[in-house]
Regions:
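Catalytic domains that recognize anionic headgroups
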Residues: 1-375
């Protein structure tokens, strides 16, 4: 919502709140005469935690809800043990009558998120009587752990795929509502994700621990009849999305790191992507250009360099091969490439002051642990 990197606005962990002085896109849209609404699906995006509701005429988050029996269960089983056992049995049961849904219905577990069906229902409700023009943010969480997938999609599919299918159907319902209310023709729809997911790639599952492309590369779709049906191969960034939308409607910009993608010509391919791992899981930072990636583990003082054109799956660390004297490696070329990327990465990092840590209460810590954001 800010067009900034986390190190810039200071919110580097979930559960932290955005400073009120930071400009947000919803405020810019509202100032430009747009009706604004947001519908989010996970507790740490509730305004009381994130402070992201600023600028929205209506922000539906449900707030954080903690069931009465859940704290008892969480004291019997530590989070890691419970998550291990729960992960093994949560989908046991016929159709929708699974262990997960049973425990959730009894109030014995709190998943801190709601289903795509609930999110779509709220978004459709916000579209009732909406004034044009409007800016809407609709956030789905089902593909993220603890993954909400109805039993009908679990037949013959793994849980991740089933959750994707569920979200796909709900996005379709939302688009159908735009059509039914004759809003689709004048609405630019943007679809994206905040991160990818490691599904066993490079020996990891989940996200936030590494900077491999399976975690960084996300879909970005701009859908409107006035736009050409084509795929843009140039590297772009999620921080460019809101600056692009504000620029398209002539609203004031955010003065942020992100830049509008469309300037009348082809999308530039030279936009560098800087990245950082989730702090709980390690101190990794990286720089990705259109053909190369440098990753630095600042805790372990290790680096990796990948030639993405020749090695798109990032299986070959050229720094290791160069040090080992592998025959097809030119050490001078590798060192030169590393030094250039390292200089750019250092330049980016030097522009930030030390992040001031925000304290969160015990309930928020418990919520973040349940969602997998604590080691």
């Amino acid at each position: 919502m800010t067009g900034q990197y986390p190190l810039d606005h200071g919110v580097v962990e979930n559960g932290w709140g955005l400073d009120e002085d930071e400009p947000v896109a919803a405020e810019r849209f509202r100032a430009a005469g747009f009706d604004t609404f947001g519908v989010v699906s996970v507790d740490h995006l509730a305004h009381e935690h994130s402070r992201l509701g600023r600028g929205f005429d209506r922000y539906v988050d449900g707030g954080s809800r903690y069931d009465a029996l859940y704290p008892i269960l969480s004291r019997i089983y530590d989070t890691k043990t419970f998550n291990t056992v729960f992960g093994a049995v949560k989908n046991v049961g016929p159709g929708r009558y699974t262990v997960k849904n049973l425990l959730r219905g009894l109030g014995l577990i709190q998943l801190h998120c709601r289903t795509a069906r609930s999110v779509t229902a709220d978004a459709v409700g916000r579209l009732e009587g909406v004034s044009e023009p409007f800016f809407g943010w609709v956030h789905y969480f089902d593909v993220h752990e603890p993954r909400n997938a109805p039993g009908e999609f679990l037949e013959g599919h793994d849980e991740y795929t089933a959750a994707m299918m569920h979200v796909d159907r709900q996005v379709g319902e939302l688009l159908a509502t735009l059509e039914d209310r004759q809003l689709r023709e004048d609405t630019l729809v943007v679809l994206t994700g905040d991160h990818g997911e490691a599904l066993g790639d490079h020996g990891y599952t989940g996200h936030g621990r590494t900077l491999y492309d399976e975690e960084l590369h996300v879909p970005l779709v701009f859908a409107h009849d006035a736009l050409p049906r084509e795929t843009v191969d140039a590297q772009v960034r999620t921080i460019d999305i809101l600056p692009t939308l504000l620029d398209l409607v002539g609203a004031d910009g955010l003065g942020a790191d992100g830049e509008p993608l469309f300037d009348g010509g082809p999308v530039r391919a030279d936009r560098p992507v800087y990245a950082m791992a989730y702090p709980t899981f390690g101190d990794r930072v990286g720089l990705r250009t259109d053909g190369w990636k440098l990753v630095r583990d600042r805790a372990g003082n290790d680096e990796a360099l990948f030639d993405l054109s020749a090695d798109p799956e990032e299986r070959r660390n050229l720094l290791e091969d160069s040090a080992a004297g592998v025959a097809d490696i030119d050490p001078d070329d590798v060192d030169g490439r590393r030094e250039a990327l390292s200089s750019d990465l250092e330049g980016w990092l030097s522009g930030f002051e030390a992040t001031e840590r925000q304290e969160v209460d015990a309930e928020t810590e418990e919520m973040l642990a349940d969602l997998g954001y604590r080691g």
